[in-house]
Amino acid sequence: GQEEVARTAHSLAGMEPGLDSERPAGPWMALRASAYELPFSDESFDCVILSEVLEHLHEDRRALAEIGRVLKPGGPLALSVPREGPEAVCWALSHEYRNSPGGHVRIYRRRKLERMINESGYEVFASHFAHALHTPFWWLKCLVGPSREGFIPVELYHKLLVWDLMKRPWITRLAEDLLN
């Protein structure tokens, strides 16, 4: 978890635009910040993780440039975005999903994303797929309406995902690996 990372890292900063307040806690802190104007000095991070963020940003290239400003030369950028196929199904299933404020503003195609990353000054050295078991959850959510609460199949699937994340049983790990 976050505490484990914080114990091994010299310092850790997490940012969230919707955060109510800043929460410093030992060697890590949570900040409310914009990806376009990060509140850090040039070259202040050894590594940056941008997980499931880029697809929410209207100016993705601007955000990548800003990350390049705070990242030390040669430092890695770990980036993840939703897979094109499953995301396209979500968009097809739900007008609400694809038009919700703060939601996903684009679907990335792998080659186009890699080209943009390279053009932004980074080098793609590895890629893989993950979260295959989460895809049916989002399809269910989109079928019934992403903001609808109390739909039993969605709630049960969510419980399965939480159980899987916490327990990591071999059967779901195998299914995830095969489906990815």
Which role fits each region the language model picked out?
Residues 92, 125, 130-180:
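A C-terminal cap/extension of S-adenosyl-L-methionine-dependent methyltransferases
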Residues 95-112, 129-130:
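Acceptor-substrate binding/catalytic loop of class I
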Residues 116-122:
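A structural motif corresponding to the C-terminal end of an alpha-helix
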